[in-house]
Amino acid sequence: MKRRAGLGGSMRSVVGFLSQRGLHGDPLLTQDFQRRRLRGCRNLYKKDLLGHFGCVNAIEFSNNGGQWLVSGGDDRRVLLWHMEQAIHSRVKPIQLKGEHHSNIFCLAFNSGNTKVFSGGNDEQVILHDVESSETLDVFAHEDAVYGLSVSPVNDNIFASSSDDGRVLIWDIRESPHGEPFCLANYPSAFHSVMFNPVEPRLLATANSKEGVGLWDIRKPQSSLLRYGGNLSLQSAMSVRFNSNGTQLLALRRRLPPVLYDIHSRLPVFQFDNQGYFNSCTMKSCCFAGDRDQYILSGSDDFNLYMWKIPADPEAGGIGRVVNGAFMVLKGHRSIVNQVRFNPHTYMICSSGVEKIIKIWSPYKQPGCTGDLDGRIEDDSRCLYTHEEYISLVLNSGSGLSHDYANQSVQEDPRMMAFFDSLVRREIEGWSSDSDSDLSESTILQLHAGVSERSGYTDSESSASLPRSPPPTVDESADNAFHLGPLRVTTTNAVASTPATPTCEDASSRQQRLSALRRYQDKRLLALSNESDSEENVCEAELDTDLFPRPRSPSPEDGSSSPSSSTSSEDEEELNQRRATTRQRNAMRRRQKTARDERPTGPAKSTNTYIGEDNYDYPQIKVDDLSPSPDSSPERSASTLDVQPSRAPPAANMESVERKIYKAYKWLRCSYISYSNNKDGETSLMAEEADEGRAGTSHKDNPTPSSSKEACLTATAQRDQDLPSEGCSSDACKEGTSAGNPNSGAGHEHSSHPWAEVPEGTSQDTNNSGPLEHSFETKKLNGKALSKALSSRAEEPPASPGPKASGSTLNSASGNCPRTQSDDSEERSLDTVCANHNNGRLHPRPLHPHNNGQSSGELETVACSSPGHLDTDHDSPSLTGTFLHKDCCGSEMACETPSAGMREDPPDPSGLDSSKVVHGQSGLKRHRIELEDTESENSSSEKKLKT
C-alpha cells in the first residue's frame, strides 16, 4: 500500500483506506465498486476477534461509518472495539466500567456514538459513556431485557422490550424514580424492538407468541398491524427495519426468515436453504448491502446464510419462497446467533456460542483465512455426545457448564458440548415427529453431514485450543455424529484409528442426501401452502410454541451415567419413553372411542304425526295418591304423565304393563258378561270376578233384561255416530263414577290380578287386525269423575303445538315386549273370561242406565291422559289411556241402593274440559246424545232411590 499525503504518512489498513479515500468525479463510484465486489464473491475472507470469556450474545456497529463495534455476552462485560485497530494490530478491546450481574442480551448506540445502552438478564439497562467508559445511569426493569433501540431523532429516548411482556419507552432526562411510558403489555415476552429509522413514531416488535407487530407511540396498548396474515401468531425472536424504513425482516422459530412490507400483513418473501435451521437458540437478523438488497441470518448448523432479495416481487413463485442462499459462510464451530453488517466497509460481524467474534470481508485483511471462491476448506469437528458433555462437566470440578473464573478466551469444550447436546436433542425431536422410515442415527448424520463446516483455524489460537475427544474404536456409528467429512491430520491417535467413523461409503451418503431432499421438499411445500391457504393454521401453531432461552442442565441429571456409557443405552431409554407415550395415547383413544360408542339412551321413535304431543311432561310416580278427597280413593285419573316420545325405564314399563293388562282383562270379561246375559241373570264370569275382590258382596242382584237390551241398542246406535278416534274422549267426559269409600282400602290390597289398579299406558295387540278402543262408562255417581276431569281441564296446555283428541302417537308393535309372566297371567285370565271376541276390544261407551248391577260396578277409562296403545304400523293409536276403576262391588251397592244410587247433576267443568281438549264435532254430538239418554232414564233411577 502506497503512502498518501494527508493521511499522516502512515500505512493504513484496507478498511481505513476504503473509508477515508476520496474519489474525484463520481461520488457513487465507491458504492458501485463495493457492490460489484460483493456480487462477484462466493465466499469471504474471515478473521476472529478474541476478547470475551463466554458466549457473545450481542454485537452492534456504531453509526455513521461503523468505526466502533460494541459486544456483550455471558461474561457480563461490555467490550468496545475499534475496528481498524482490532483488525490490523490486534489491539485489545476497551472494557466499559459498568458491569452487569448476569448475561448481556442486547446493545445499542445512540446516534452520535457517544453513549452505549446495554441490557440483560439482570433486569436492568445500563447507560455507558463511550469516552470515559463510566456508567451514566441504570434503568431497572421487572424482568430480563431482551431488546433495545434508540430513537433516531432524539438520543434521550430509547425503547426496551423485556421478558415480562412489556415494551417501555424511556427518557434518560427523567428522574430515576420516574415511571416509563408503556407502549405494549402482553402476557408473553417481547424479544426484540426497533424504531423506524425514517418515521420515529413507529416501532416494530417481535413477540414470543404474538409474532411481529407494528406500533405507534401515539396509540399505546394496541398494535397498528399484525404481520403474518392467517399465520400471525408465530414465535418471533428478531425484527429489523431496512434503512428506508419500508420493509421489515423477521426471524421465527423453526421457520425461515421472512420479509414484510410495513403496510401489508402478508409476507413479501420467505428465504430458505438446505441445512438452514433455527430452533435451539435466540438469534437476530439484519439487512446487507448498500441498498439493503441482501439479508443475513445465523443457523443451528454452525453456518451463516446470506440471501439476495429478488427485484421482481413474483420471483419467488408459489408462496414467494426464495430457495437457495446467495452465500453460505462456513467457519463457526458452533451455533451462530448474532450478525451485523456495516454498509460503509461491507464488513460482516457474527457471533454465537463461541467466545470469538468472526469478521467477514470481501477484502483480504492481515491474518485472515479463506478465499473468495470457497475452494479452501478448513477443518471441522465432531459433535460432542451427551455422555461426553456430562463427563466434561463432572471432570471439570465445577457444577456449571460454563465457568468464567479463569478468564480464558480459548474455546471451552464444556460450552461447546452443552450446545451440541441441545442440537442433538432438537434433531432427535424432529426425527421422532417425522414420518420417515430412516433410523434416528441416519437422520442425525444426514442433518449435519450435508452442512459441511470449515474448522476454526486461526493461526495463533488454534494450536492452543483443545480438540474434541476423538471417537473410540468401540463406539457405535450413532456416536459418530459428525459435521461433514473430516480431515483429521493433527492427532496421531485419531489418524491411527482403523475404524474411524468419519469415513462413509457412497451408499450411506446417497441415503442421507435423498432423505434430506425429501425433508426439504416437505418444508418447501409447507411454506408454499402457508402463504396461499388457511388450512395450515394447526401446523403453524405447532411450530410456534415458545422455546425459552437455553439454560445449562444440572450435572445431577446425568450423574448416574458414567462417561463410558454408550449411546445405545440412551437410545434404549428414548425408545422406552416413546413406547410409554404411544401406549398412553392409544389408551386415551380407546377410552374416547368407548365413550363415543356408548348408547346415550333407549331408542326413540322418529315418526311424528300431526297432533302428537311432544312436550316433556314431568314424570310422576305411579303410586302417588290422588289429592282430591272426592275422587277415587285409590288414584286420580291424572296422576301420571308419560312422555309419548320417550320410553320409561324397562322395570317401570313392565310393572305398568302388567297392571294395565290385568285390569283390561278383567274389564273386558265383566263387560262381555253383561252384554251376553240378556235373560237378567248375572254372568258367572262377573260373579267370579266380583268374588275375588276384597270388600265386595257375594249376593246376586237381579236386573231386568229389558233394560240391558235397551242399553245394548243405544250403545250400537252411538257406535255408528261416534268416531273411532274421539270415542274415548266424550265417553269419559260424560261417564261419571262414584264408589263406596269404605271399600277402597280393601280393594286396593286385593291379591287378585283383576283387582289391581290400572295405571295407564300401553297394550300390545295383534297386528293382523285393526285395534278398536273399548271404553266402558257406567254411572253410579257423576261427582267423582267429573271433578277429576275438571281438575285435568284446568291445567294449562303443556305444549304449544296442536293436539289431536286423545293425543295420538304411533308406536310400533314391538315397543312393549311381553314377558313370560304376562303370558302366564293372560292364560289364567282366559280361563275366567272365555268369551273375549278373539282379543279385539270394541268401543262400546255405555251410557248411565238404571239397572242395579251397573250402579255398583264402575270401570272408567279416562281418555285424556297420555299413554300408549299400539296399533298397526299404518294407523296411529290413541295414547294416554288411563283406567280408573271404582272400588265398590256390585252386590254391596245393591244392598244399599238409597246410599249409593243418588244422582248428581253433571259438573259443568267436566263438560268444559271436553270442549277444551277435544274440538271435534262428532264428540260434541255424542255428548248431547248421552245427556238425552241420561234424562230419559232419570225417572227409573229416581224410582230406585225411593
Curated annotation (Swiss-Prot):
Residues 449-478, 527-656, 675-860, 894-946 are annotated as: Disordered. Residues 454-465, 760-769, 808-819 have a biased composition (Polar residues). The keyword Lyase does not apply. Disulfide bonds: none annotated. Residues 579-592 have a biased composition (Basic residues). Pathway: Protein modification; protein ubiquitination. The keyword Repeat applies. The modification Phosphothreonine is found at T500. GO terms for cellular component: Cul4-RING E3 ubiquitin ligase complex; mitochondrion. Residues 531-544 have a biased composition (Acidic residues). WD repeats lie at residues 51-91, 99-139, 140-180, 185-225, 277-317, 331-370. PROSITE patterns: WD_REPEATS_2 (PS50082), WD_REPEATS_REGION (PS50294). The modification Phosphoserine is found at S531, S533, S626, S628, S645. Residues 555-567, 625-638 have a biased composition (Low complexity). Interacts with DDB1, CUL4A or CUL4B. Interacts with L3MBTL3. Interacts with SOX2. Interacts with DNMT1. Interacts with E2F1. Is a substrate receptor for the CUL4-DDB1 E3 ubiquitin-protein ligase complex (CRL4), involved in the ubiquitination of a set of methylated non-histone proteins, including SOX2. The complex CRL4-DCAF5 is also involved in the ubiquitination of methylated DNMT1 and E2F1. This is DDB1- and CUL4-associated factor 5.
